[in-house]
């Protein structure tokens, strides 16, 4: 039987910086959930901006959480279960943050590099939405 090797891939969750006591509690709860599921994280303070569908531009300080998500390297069901477990935990944490901080969605980058915008119910924001076309850049 071939021995499984433990490897890690980076996941990322981005949340708005807390604005009030309720947000600070939600942030502390999220950090506890990340530590419990993955053993720890690195938090970086940053700045984010996004444009709503109506054209309104939002700018806000954010916290970026980099998380080492364990991935079993090897064949078989154990590797698949490990991957599914990491994604389930990440999605659950992102949805919890969205609920607790009253966010429409929370940015989650999976260990495979795919970006999700997770809604409070745990589904992807863009799951049933037609993607926006990229604007043409002249040059």
Model-predicted segments: where are they?
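Positively charged, small/polar-rich N-terminal and surface patches that mediate targeting and assembly
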Residues: 1-139
């Amino acid at each position: 039987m071939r021995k499984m090797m433990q490897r890690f891939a980076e996941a990322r969750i981005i949340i708005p910086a807390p604005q009030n006591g309720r947000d600070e509690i939600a942030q502390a709860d999220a950090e506890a959930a990340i530590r419990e599921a993955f053993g720890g994280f690195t938090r970086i303070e940053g700045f984010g901006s996004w444009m709503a569908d109506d054209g309104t531009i939002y700018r806000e300080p954010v916290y970026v959480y980099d998380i080492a998500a364990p991935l079993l390297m090897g064949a078989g069901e154990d590797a698949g279960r490990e991957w599914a477990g990491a994604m389930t935990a990440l999605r659950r944490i992102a949805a919890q943050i969205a609920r607790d901080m009253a966010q429409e969605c929370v940015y989650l980058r999976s260990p495979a590099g795919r970006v999700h915008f997770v809604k409070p119910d745990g589904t992807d924001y863009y799951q049933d939405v037609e993607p926006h076309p990229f604007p043409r850049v002249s040059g």
